[in-house]
Amino acid sequence: DTMLGDRQVGMVDAHGNAASFTGERTFDWAGGRVGSPDSVGNVAGGKGEVILGRTFAAQANIMVSDQTVRNMAESFAQSTGSLPDRLMAALRAGQAGGGDKRGMQSAALLVVRKGGGYLGANDRFVDIRVYDAPDPIAELARLLALHKLHFFPTDPADLEPITPAIVRQLEPILLSEPKGQPQKWLTAPQGTANAVFLAALRDFMYWENYDVRVRMDGQIDRVVLQDILAKRAAAH
């Protein structure tokens, strides 16, 4: 490879073995870090070096300083939770360390899992990107939140019974919004989460793309409820 000195790459295999390489001709600051083989700290590498480790590989070039990659590595190593959330936290930490010398413009997040896409139709568990924005990491975080809302299943901790108070919050929407249908979601107030109300709420949620969070057991996803009400409040 005659262009080896201009390249930078990081890899982690299915067994957690990590490697990072930074070419000699990459622009300063340039380098990478991988998780330590003994799971304590991380291993740093500079230009012309291949470094080997475990669990993650973080690398960058044209950075303000090495603090960007240092922050990313430390954030990922210390964080818990889902992989998308940990990667998002690492991006934020990296930017807080200085980021790109040229400023901010774009950001992307790709997480692949077998059958992890919508309804298992593909392997793109998360595939979002921001091409041009004043604060691309903040915008990426907003898009990740939307992606999780519409494509991730309900967290059982977010379930709550549909009380008469919640029915009163949702019925005006179901009674007034046709959303392109020949009739409203509800034709008359129900006052309680009976079968008629639940069927109307189900159809409404499918229409609004909350497909993976639809339920018919008298409970509602708190995150969905908050999103529905926030959208209507913003529209008035």
Named regions from a protein language model:
Residues 156-236:
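Short acidic, glycine/serine/threonine-rich helix-capping segments at coil-helix boundaries
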Residues 1-164:
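N-terminal nucleophile
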